[in-house]
């Protein structure tokens, strides 16, 4: 068990700056979103602004700043974790830890996914909590379905970074990168209405 904790500590040293910067930006963006929302409520009144969100065409996507935030967090964590291993050839040192290679790579992936889960739990949880205090369920439920898709995309992009960085074959790297871009594009269509991804999210 000790080698796994040593591995986690090594990964933490590499990724802590990216993680805390992403978390700070994420929480700051949520604060900024709701400062804007409260200003609009002050100017228009709560009822008028809520009706504007529900019935305007095109829709008022007041939370649009969240769209690429989980993606950027996952990219920064993934790059800080895997690029030094490959670019500086540290992966050879990592492979000399007294752990099987499969266990090693699973541990690295688990660590990264755990960081992304913590980021998502804090930022998304904070956003949904603030949202529920300001808007009725007619707004909060469709909005929740929409932003879930964006936060789930972070897991995909992290995995594709890991696959691409650790793959020694250039053609497979290209295949992983192109496949990743195609899959990720499904998460970032323009949102035509609140709850646009409701049928495909829990």
What is the predicted role of each segment?
Residues 3, 88-92, 159:
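Short, well-structured alpha-helical interface segments that form or flank functional binding sites
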Residues 99-119, 188-201:
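C-terminal halves and exits of single transmembrane alpha-helices
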Residues 30-41, 48-74, 106-170:
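Secretory targeting signals
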Residues 2, 69-72, 76, 84-88:
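Generic alpha-helical scaffold signal
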Residues 1-68, 80, 166, 170-202:
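Hydrophobic alpha-helical transmembrane segments
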């Amino acid at each position: 068990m000790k080698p796994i904790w040593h591995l986690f500590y090594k990964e933490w040293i590499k990724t802590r700056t990216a993680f805390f910067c992403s978390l700070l930006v994420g929480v700051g963006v949520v604060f900024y979103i709701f400062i804007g929302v409260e200003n609009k409520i002050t100017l228009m009144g709560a009822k008028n602004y809520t009706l504007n969100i529900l019935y305007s065409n095109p829709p008022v996507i007041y939370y649009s700043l969240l769209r690429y935030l989980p993606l950027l967090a996952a990219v920064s964590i993934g790059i800080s974790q895997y690029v030094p291993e490959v670019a500086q050839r540290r992966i050879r040192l990592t492979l000399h830890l007294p752990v099987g290679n499969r266990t090693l790579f699973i541990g690295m992936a688990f660590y990264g996914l755990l960081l992304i889960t913590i980021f998502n739990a804090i930022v998304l949880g904070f956003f949904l909590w603030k949202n529920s205090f300001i808007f009725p369920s007619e707004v909060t439920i469709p909005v929740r379905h929409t932003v879930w898709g964006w936060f789930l995309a972070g897991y995909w992009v992290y995995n594709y970074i890991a696959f691409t960085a650790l793959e020694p074959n250039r053609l497979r790297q290209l295949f992983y990168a192109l496949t990743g871009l195609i899959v990720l594009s499904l998460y970032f269509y323009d949102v035509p209405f609140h709850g646009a991804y409701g049928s495909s999210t829990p």
